[in-house]
Swiss-Prot record:
Domain remark text: The IMP cyclohydrolase activity resides in the N-terminal region.
Keywords in alphabetical order: Hydrolase, Multifunctional enzyme, Purine biosynthesis, Transferase
Limits of the MGS-like domain: 1-148
Species in which this protein is naturally found: Salmonella paratyphi A (strain AKU_12601)
Top-level taxonomic group: Bacteria
Keyword Heme: no
The protein's name in its UniProt record: Bifunctional purine biosynthesis protein PurH
A biological process term (GO) from this entry: 'de novo' IMP biosynthetic process
Reactions listed under catalytic activity: (6R)-10-formyltetrahydrofolate + 5-amino-1-(5-phospho-beta-D-ribosyl)imidazole-4-carboxamide = 5-formamido-1-(5-phospho-D-ribosyl)imidazole-4-carboxamide + (6S)-5,6,7,8-tetrahydrofolate; IMP + H2O = 5-formamido-1-(5-phospho-D-ribosyl)imidazole-4-carboxamide
Gene Ontology MF, one: phosphoribosylaminoimidazolecarboxamide formyltransferase activity
Pathway: Purine metabolism; IMP biosynthesis via de novo pathway; 5-formamido-1-(5-phospho-D-ribosyl)imidazole-4-carboxamide from 5-amino-1-(5-phospho-D-ribosyl)imidazole-4-carboxamide (10-formyl THF route): step 1/1; Purine metabolism; IMP biosynthesis via de novo pathway; IMP from 5-formamido-1-(5-phospho-D-ribosyl)imidazole-4-carboxamide: step 1/1
EC number: 2.1.2.3, 3.5.4.10
UniProt-listed Gene3D superfamilies: 3.40.140.20, Methylglyoxal synthase-like domain (3.40.50.1380)
Gene name of this polypeptide: purH
């Protein structure tokens, strides 16, 4: 597929003008005639480039506040005309061939994301002429190059220089695929935006816009192929969203180590999202998507030491996340103590990276600092469908807690309860977390019965020689029976935090009172499956 087509005439019309001046200058320097519209044409003219306004080229002015610019036979005939087949009809109607179209579309996503965006604003940012030109050029990729991404500008100029001003069919075909992906994503955004309004239009909701659209169109960009998926017989790849506004695994920069695996990414996401819950210097160690050690302290070194003590056995080969910059002292403590798959932090000092570089297999990611969590959607694939829900960003404050036991918690118990409640949110259900003095001392995860999660948390603490007496226990959901409270009391738990809501709440509260345990209700559940 090496059939070449020279680029003699290009039409440039972009909303995102990053790099467009330099690209236009490079095209013009290579003898390419430039056509352009509106703001793009004015910008190029201001830079001294010879550019023809599309309205002058067609003999037809822009109208309706710019709604009609390029929807003209001289434009689309020049793009869609098949070289060697439509030449006579093009000549008859004075239609010149357009060999390259450089277009990106009105910023619809950015517009509707702005607070207070009206329906009228959204409508005016639906591009019509742009997608039409993009699709026309992509359809006729045998003769025309369509450029929708500024990241392709340099490569296009290099190829033109290597091919006497021409582009190969391979390149034009690849650009066409990107163009169709671009317009598909654009139409999906518009469909999702208007689809979310359907319930309101039909009187099914009092909200101005329903939370979920009638049809859901998703657009993700492949970031990397994986060696394999969750298991070696499964193929896999990692896709990311565009314009992610929150520090995440998807946007993190890998500064050291071999390529991330499928399981690395899943586990690192779990660790990072957990450590984001804490304002104090914090460390989270994750194994198989479950926290196995969490602590907060005055420094991340001390937080790491305390998190590691929870379960050194499980920490081997784990993922470590911090909410502060990784420093050399902490990096040295990790490298000298354990095997670790991934370390992720907002940033890392040069000295820390020199230390981790001694272990080439250790992957180090920096994700940038975060200010607040960004609402969004969570997805879970089921056979034949997709479950969609809001991200679980819920968290209770001290003022929202309800003490339901006879005994009030002490200040330390209250701090420990709130700490382990944050951790329990990220442990697979049924989740039980024991904590004392801002560190986890036992975690029971993923058991089918809640009482066994409570027992396992106690066993883990005993195995590591950690003192449970006087600790707090968090449960991600209510206790259906009193047995979980009895199990906690047997190992010395003195305070329990849980959502409440069981039909046997009275029995559970009575059990707490019998054991002298302070019990706190959050009225919020944190199932995690």
């Amino acid at each position: 597929m090496q059939q070449r087509r020279p680029v003699r005439r290009a039409l440039l019309s972009v909303s995102d003008k990053a790099g467009i001046i330099e690209f236009a200058q490079a095209l013009s320097a290579r003898g390419v005639e430039l056509l352009s519209t509106g703001g793009t044409a004015r910008l190029l003219a201001e830079k001294g480039l010879p550019v023809t306004e599309v309205s002058d080229y067609t003999g037809f002015p822009e109208m309706m506040d710019g709604r009609v610019k390029t929807l003209h036979p001289k434009v689309h005939g020049g793009i869609l005309g098949r070289r060697g087949q439509d030449d006579a009809i093009m000549e008859q109607h004075h239609i010149a061939p357009i060999d390259m179209v450089v277009v990106n579309l009105y910023p619809f996503a950015e517009t509707v994301a702005r607070e207070g965006c009206s329906l009228e604003d959204a409508v005016e940012n639906i591009d019509i002429g742009g997608p039409t030109m993009v699709r026309s050029a992509a359809k006729n990729h045998k003769d025309v190059a369509i450029v929708v991404k500024s990241s392709d500008y340099d490569a296009i100029i290099k190829e033109m220089d290597a091919n006497e001003g021409s582009l190969t069919l391979d390149t034009r075909f690849d650009l066409a695929i990107k163009a169709f992906e671009h317009t598909a994503a654009y139409d999906s955004m518009i469909a999702n935006y208007f689809g979310s309004m359907v319930p309101a239009y039909h009187g099914e909701s009092k909200e101005a816009a329903g939370r979920f659209p009638r049809t859901l169109n998703l657009n993700f960009i492949k970031k990397q192929d994986m060696r394999y998926g969750e298991n070696s017989h499964q193929q896999a790849a990692f896709y990311i969203e565009e314009n992610v506004k929150e520090a995440s695994v998807a946007t993190a920069q890998q500064v050291q180590g071999k390529a991330l695996s499928y399981n690395n990414i899943a586990d690192t996401d779990a660790a990072l999202e957990c450590v984001k819950e804490f304002n104090e210097p914090a460390c989270v160690i994750v194994k198989h998507a479950n926290p196995c050690g969490v602590a907060v302290s005055t420094t991340i070194l001390d937080a790491y030491d305390r998190a590691y003590k929870t379960d050194p056995t499980s920490a081997f080969g784990g993922i470590i996340a911090f909410n502060r910059e990784l420093d050399a002292e902490t990096a040295q403590a990790i490298i000298s103590r354990q095997f670790v798959e991934v370390i992720i932090a907002p940033s890392a000092t040069e000295d820390a990276l020199k230390i981790t570089a001694a272990k080439q297999n250790v992957r180090v990611l920096t994700c940038g600092q975060w200010a607040q969590r960004v609402p969004g959607l969570d997805f879970k694939r089921v056979n034949g469908g997709l479950l969609v829900q809001d991200r679980d960003l819920g968290m209770v404050s001290e003022a929202e807690l309800r003490v339901v036991s006879k005994r009030q918690p002490t200040e330390q118990e209250l701090r420990d309860a709130l700490f382990c409640w944050k951790v329990a949110k990220f442990v697979k259900s049924n989740a039980i977390v024991y904590a004392k003095e801002n560190m986890t001392i036992g975690i029971g995860a993923g058991q089918m019965s809640r009482v066994y999660s409570a027992k396992i948390a106690g066993i883990k603490a005993a195995d590591e020689g950690l003192e449970v007496k006087g600790s707090a226990m968090a449960s991600d959901a209510f206790f259906p029976f009193r047995d979980g409270i009895d199990a906690a009391a047997a190992v010395g738990v003195s305070c329990v935090i849980q959502p409440g809501g069981s039909i046997r709440d009275d029995e559970v509260i009575a059990a707490a009172d019998e054991h002298g345990i302070a019990m706190i209700f959050t009225d919020m559940r944190h199932f995690r499956h």
